[in-house]
Amino acid sequence: MAADDDNGDGTSLFDVFSASPLKNNDEGSLDIYAGLDSAVSDSASKSCVPSRNCLDLYEEILTEEGTAKEATYNDLQVEYGKCQLQMKELMKKFKEIQTQNFSLINENQSLKKNISALIKTARVEINRKDEEISNLHQRLSEFPHFRNNHKTARTFDTVKTKDLKSRSPHLDDCSKTDHRAKSDVSKDVHHSTSLPNLEKEGKPHSDKRSTSHLPTSVEKHCTNGVWSRSHYQVGEGSSNEDSRRGRKDIRHSQFNRGTERVRKDLSTGCGDGEPRILEASQRLQGHPEKYGKGEPKTESKSSKFKSNSDSDYKGERINSSWEKETPGERSHSRVDSQSDKKLERQSERSQNINRKEVKSQDKEERKVDQKPKSVVKDQDHWRRSERASLPHSKNEITFSHNSSKYHLEERRGWEDCKRDKSVNSHSFQDGRCPSSLSNSRTHKNIDSKEVDAMHQWENTPLKAERHRTEDKRKREQESKEENRHIRNEKRVPTEHLQKTNKETKKTTTDLKKQNEPKTDKGEVLDNGVSEGADNKELAMKAESGPNETKNKDLKLSFMKKLNLTLSPAKKQPVSQDNQHKITDIPKSSGVCDSESSMQVKTVAYVPSISEHILGEAAVSEHTMGETKSTLLEPKVALLAVTEPRIGISETNKEDENSLLVRSVDNTMHCEEPICGTETSFPSPMEIQQTESLFPSTGMKQTINNGRAAAPVVMDVLQTDVSQNFGLELDTKRNDNSDYCGISEGMEMKVALSTTVSETTESILQPSIEEADILPIMLSEDNNPKFEPSVIVTPLVESKSCHLEPCLPKETLDSSLQQTELMDHRMATGETNSVYHDDDNSVLSIDLNHLRPIPEAISPLNSPVRPVAKVLRNESPPQVPVYNNSHKDVFLPNSAHSTSKSQSDLNKENQKPIYKSDKCTEADTCKNSPLDELEEGEIRSDSETSKPQESFEKNSKRRVSADVRKSKTIPRRGKSTVCLDKDSRKTHVRIHQTNNKWNKRPDKSSRSSKTEKKDKVMSTSSLEKIVPIIAVPSSEQEIMHMLRMIRKHVRKNYMKFKAKFSLIQFHRIIESAILSFTSLIKHLNLHKISKSVTTLQKNLCDIIESKLKQVKKNGIVDRLFEQQLPDMKKKLWKFVDDQLDYLFAKLKKILVCDSKSFGRDSDEGKLEKTSKQNAQYSNSQKRSVDNSNRELLKEKLSKSEDPVHYKSLVGCKKSEENYQDQNNSSINTVKHDIKKNFNICFDNIKNSQSEERSLEVHCPSTPKSEKNEGSSIEDAQTSQHATLKPERSFEILTEQQASSLTFNLVSDAQMGEIFKSLLQGSDLLDSSVNCTEKSEWELKTPEKQLLETLKCESIPACTTEELVSGVASPCPKMISDDNWSLLSSEKGPSLSSGLSLPVHPDVLDESCMFEVSTNLPLSKDNVCSVEKSKPCVSSILLEDLAVSLTVPSPLKSDGHLSFLKPDMSSSSTPEEVISAHFSEDALLEEEDASEQDIHLALESDNSSSKSSCSSSWTSRSVAPGFQYHPNLPMHAVIMEKSNDHFIVKIRRATPSTSSGLKQSMMPDELLTSLPRHGKEADEGPEKEYISCQNTVFKSVEELENSNKNVDGSKSTHEEQSSMIQTQVPDIYEFLKDASDKMGHSDEVADECFKLHQVWETKVPESIEELPSMEEISHSVGEHLPNTYVDLTKDPVTETKNLGEFIEVTVLHIDQLGCSGGNLNQSAQILDNSLQADTVGAFIDLTQDASSEAKSEGNHPALAVEDLGCGVIQVDEDNCKEEKAQVANRPLKCIVEETYIDLTTESPSSCEVKKDELKSEPGSNCDNSELPGTLHNSHKKRRNISDLNHPHKKQRKETDLTNKEKTKKPTQDSCENTEAHQKKASKKKAPPVTKDPSSLKATPGIKDSSAALATSTSLSAKNVIKKKGEIIILWTRNDDREILLECQKRGPSFKTFAYLAAKLDKNPNQVSERFQQLMKLFEKSKCR
């Protein structure tokens, strides 16, 4: 019927219906016939109208048909209606999906915009480089004509020879001659580079080269122009320089594409200047660019230079494409091209050598001109062919080329910078340029030559095979001819080479001199170090590179960001080519490519050069290139070189650093290609390369296979080079620590350390006997550097697997050594695991190459992503942490030394740190390959060097036990080992290094253990879940196994579908109970406890009872009843929290038990463990436990040292466990930061000693001993974080550490990370521990337990531990975990650099509440702690501006999930949390408006710059509040997008609040918070007012800084926590202050006045404010400003509360504040405060309230702060909330205050004042307040938003609106409550709202407090997507929403009305309301 209807029966149907139905109707009432007529007529269409009789029947039929049709039609209509409804529903869904799609599209587009910006940048770079290349090609194409015009070339040669003659006699004339040559060249070569030439001419080569090396330029000129040797070298050196300069210039060109030509001209000019005499020929060789355009010689040189630079660029490009080729292809093509190139280079070298002789120079110049012409032609053809053949990959190539060039340039630039410091000793890879300038240029040229040649040869198969046939044939013919000449020349040069060898020896000194004098000495250096000089020049090039490179770095860093997948391969191409050449043609590769003609001589020469600087870098390349022939020599030379290097180390340090960086970078870049290359020279590089290449390990393997012949040489070189690199690394580390800023230093260190550590480690590995020594050196020196090596470690891990297969061909030992070295690097690198993990994953972002990266740490840069993968291995994160701790000892070795050091440590568990470092270095290095083979577990390779094997065996067993814990975290294990600076820590290392062993030995030991009880799983089944350590020696091992089971349980749970039954859940929990209890029962705990059965029973009972509670639980039942879509996630979150709590409880029991047990004989047990191999793992555990107990005992006896050790041990254990879980990433972050600190501080040992002094405040201790601090942090973290880190913080933390992460992180992770960031924990450190903070901030009773336990549950341990500042494991577990985790994160990173006792308050805002008992002690220590802390904290304090690009789960609301109140509140007091949240809000609001983030494309230079160690160190020394890291540091959310946050962690202000102030903070803050807060606000701006007013001053300072930045958030949080902790003291202090004032009321009044005064002083700027009411309002608003102005007085005032009050009174008088209003508000506040004051705070609150009353609005805040005990940092907000606190629960108010303060202290202050005034009945102030608020807000915003007028305006508007709303809010408590909710939810924007609402409605206090808390949690005021403000919510908006919803109810009409009013989408409004309500509810829950 439907078909009929549709088909047109529709009409007939309707006809029927119109006719037949009518008849049906008629039939009933009419005659059939009567109807029949009509029926016949109507239905005539259907019925033929037969006979009438028939018609009757027909009519019936018709009616039946009609009715049937009607029925079917009706049915169809019903169906149609249903379908319509369905359509409507679907359309609704569609629209919803469309809206979602739209939002997603918007997000995507914002992402695309960012990415496109990056891509555009990359394309611009690519285009620029293409243009450069095309220009070079044009020149080259021009050069062929010039080549043909040999007359012209010869003419130029004659000119050049004339120049040479004139210049050779005069070094000084070199520059002149260079200029002449330049002018000549510019005339001849003017081409398009006339401007660049002019520039070059204008800038003599010295100038140009003087970028990094002025002397070098002169030296090079002199060297090249004057000396035959220099000429000789200059041939190469010039080309190298040219290529290097070309690259430098490329960097320049990156900035200035015109500079490209300038660069070319620079290189040409430089080449001209250097070898002016030689340059005719050399330029033809090395600087074709320079001469190519003007004259034949220029032509040939410029053509060659073009070919060099072109091949450099193109070579790089080709290199990238070549890298893309299979290694075999590369090796073959490389071999072919290299063989050709060898000839060429040999001829060139011989020519260069001959050129050294002016006579031979001219000839050779012509020859070289001819040859370079042919070469250039070949290269041109080759490049053209390459371009032609690789056009598709051209962008890629260009990109990789850019990146490689960028990396090279980066390296070179960085090296150049170092070279500026010490240019001489760097003969980088090519080491051909005699003078450093020529080196840099020659390096470029040689690099380009070699790379080009390599590319030509490598790409020759691609393009070269096409054009190569022609070009190569020509080139080969020419090269053969040249080679003949060269050979003839070589015969002469052989002498030269011998001379060169001798001279190279001289060159070491000469090079130094040359680099330093860079003039006359270049002569000898040139001859002797033609290659060495080239290397130097390369290094110089690298050095000069940084100038351009850093410029280029931005783009390249962006490129790298874009290149995230480009991976070092593309960055590596140039160096890779060199190294590949080295590998494939050991002689021709590396330096040999350029020196191939000199190969034979180079063999002899290389050794000598190797001995010299070449030995450092050139040897690496020379030996690499000539590894086979000169392998032994270079090895000896390298060994010799290491010594000279040490001599040269100062200069070499930088030079070598640059060289190393370059070579390492090259290796890193070449890591894929060098894989094989590593076989010969690059073994160190190989490690690096393999690491960076790790993803391309297959390639590496192929390369290795292709270069199987080279392995021996590579091993030798590996050892030598590694050693050299190690030395270089040592120097470089020093340089890094000194030279690099924190971010820059960190990144550079990461890059350098990684590469260096790799090289050093590979060196160490090959020369294992030396490895112990070198590793120690490296470990000590490298450790600071080896932060970066963290990255390497993960790479090594994966690499080791591949390397083993490939490297074993060479030498299993060497490969193992390499791997171990890599492991070392990994261990060290793991510190920077973030970075090098990125290298691993984001190989394209070679931090080594990204030397300038410090500028940009952004999601774009996210090197971390790849790291995340490695991090997943879990080893890198922990290693870095521990590496930090053991930076000196283990960093390089940590991964490798883990097993070794573990064995050593196990043997001497407490004292083998150094020994184990050495041993573990070598041992770990050996073990690392196998260990790293398995990502989850570090297999300590018995294959590792045999000397280490014994250790490893011992450590294996130990590790077997430990590994089970750290098994999943081999890197962590290593880091643990590193952590085990104390012998105890070593066991962790060992156990993790021996993860694989653990699996095996552990299995045996496990199997030895049989089931003990009936209700237990079989050991075999258990072992399937977890490697059982039958006789665990430490609580950590037990916890590790438990965590493994927990992971297994989670794994099983996650196998469930989204919906599953309660029975299934019960089964999972039951299986978990069985697994846990079975494990406990299987374990032999005799090493941990005396009463094993009792302990087991207790543990099993706790597990069963807790898990049964989890099984049968109302929450679980409700979750199953609700069957929410995310039930599974929520349920597991609940289970996870419970398990966290359970684990913490178990750990407490184990720790306490092991403490008592461990006191017996830690040393003896440790010794036993070291003695007993079988018992090693157990012994180690025991020794760890013993050391823990011992530490605890010591701690008890000497609270400091014992605490330190205990906490270290406990931390180590917990770290170990936590590492095993996911702490590794957190630790890595911490350690990265710590390493930075350490690098800056290099106070590990000092910090250790200091650490003991700090041990009482062990969490603080982290600063003193990064290792121990890290251990403590880790322990704390691991205890709680071990539980929670499992969740997923590991990745995030590590990502945070790396600052760049695109790794997917869970919302919880993101939230944790960000929460920690926003909460002000040391953002990087706390990124680790902050997450951990959240992690250990157990949402479960643990928080309370922690608080109670720290004092009561674990009186002995906890009290001591609390006293020790969470030093002991127990307190760590309990209270320490809560605050000490944060503190350890914060404190350790801060204090790690400083070895001073860190006050818990100082250490950790989160742990502040825990420190209350320790406050008295802490107070005393606070000053010292703060003093010691400043350096460490300075990193963050100092505008560390670490741009953390945290992948944010926030999609629109993500911040809600990401700022989970439960997470942050779990461990920290609500007040602290509110402080965090308020800081968060401030961050968010100010961030959105003030801190307009400039996308990370340009990474935050300020952050990297300000994070320079020197900068933040000096800053940390800032007077007064050295504890600033927490207070002043704030994470400024530079960019908030759905994907990520770019958080800049910067110091809020150099707030000077000192420890005294902090200690005073609780009471003083509470009572005098208004005063001190304002003072503090003023203080920071005017001066750091005395530290005595620490908290409030610092709070205000923070507020100022918050206003300026969002740093005050952390400050607020910290201060809040501190306030809580310090409340008694502060209370007393406040009482004292109040007494000083006469009485608390007077004090309060005076404080109020003071606040007013402060405000008034702010009004001083805002004198327009007529009345004191206005002033008081404005004071609150202006507090930021006020405290600025008042700071003069406040400094005094902060010193003396009485003085402060007096000053305040004076200010009040000056302001002429309306005393009545102030008094009224004060009274009101006083009443409310007194009534609402909380607990002990009540007294303080009363005092504070009176003070606050005297302050006016602030008194309420003061009361609130007092009541909260967390006087939250923002004075204004605190005051606001204090006033509100009087009316409402202080905590709520405090939270609100935080939010308000965070958002806008001025606004909140204004609001508060408004509310206060309105409360007192001064409503007139409300009307005035808006203006005042605007003024103060303006001021505050002006302070913070000077650069953000829009934000100011918006905030002003918000303030006005808020003020307007405030009156209504005051009118209705509900409204105020809504405002409070709004404010709290808005965190930043609603600040004003919250205070007003709070004040207006005491009842709302809770909600407002909750809102405040939730504000920090979620409601984003500014929703940005990729930097674009999509939605902007102001406090006024929130207030309107809340008020309207209160009045009208949350209906759609209300939302529509609000949407119209607010100009928003109703959906947005409703969403915002929901967010605010969520926040409000969350805050309520809190």
UniProtKB/Swiss-Prot annotation:
**TM stretches of this protein:** none
Domain of life, per UniProt, equals Eukaryota
- Compositionally skewed regions (Basic and acidic residues) per UniProt: 159-191, 198-210, 286-395, 406-423, 444-455, 463-524, 905-924, 936-965, 999-1016, 1157-1170, 1851-1865
Modification N-acetylalanine occurs at: A2
Keywords from UniProt, A to Z, are: Acetylation, Activator, Apoptosis, Cell cycle, Cytoplasm, Mitochondrion, Nucleus, Phosphoprotein, Repressor, Transcription, Transcription regulation
- Location (main, coarse): cytoplasm
Identify the residue span(s) of motif SUMO interaction motif 3 (SIM): 1794-1798
Q: Name one GO cellular component term.
A: mitochondrion
Q: Where is the composition biased (Polar residues)?
A: 225-240, 396-405, 894-904, 1171-1181, 1269-1281
Q: Position of motif SUMO interaction motif 1 (SIM)?
A: 1683-1687
UniProt motif (SUMO interaction motif 2 (SIM)) ranges: 1737-1741
A Gene Ontology molecular function term for this protein is: transcription corepressor activity
Region annotated NCOA2-binding sits at 1709-1982
Q: Which residues carry this modification: N6-acetyllysine?
A: K1343
The segments labelled Disordered in the record are 159-552, 569-593, 875-1017, 1157-1188, 1251-1283, 1803-1909
Positions modified as Phosphoserine?
S20, S194, S567, S658, S815, S875, S940, S1161
Answer yes or no on keyword Transcription regulation: yes
Summarize the record's induction comment: By TNF which induces strong nuclear localization.
* Record text on subunit structure and interactions: Self-associates. Component of the death-inducing signaling complex (DISC) with CASP8, FADD and FAS. Interacts with NCOA2 and NCOA3. Interacts with SRRT. Interacts with TRAF2. Interacts with NPAT. Interacts (via SIM domains) with SUMO1 and SUMO2. Interacts with SP100; may negatively regulate CASP8AP2 export from the nucleus to the cytoplasm.
Protein name as annotated = CASP8-associated protein 2
Organism, scientific name: Homo sapiens (Human)
Gene that specifies this protein: CASP8AP2
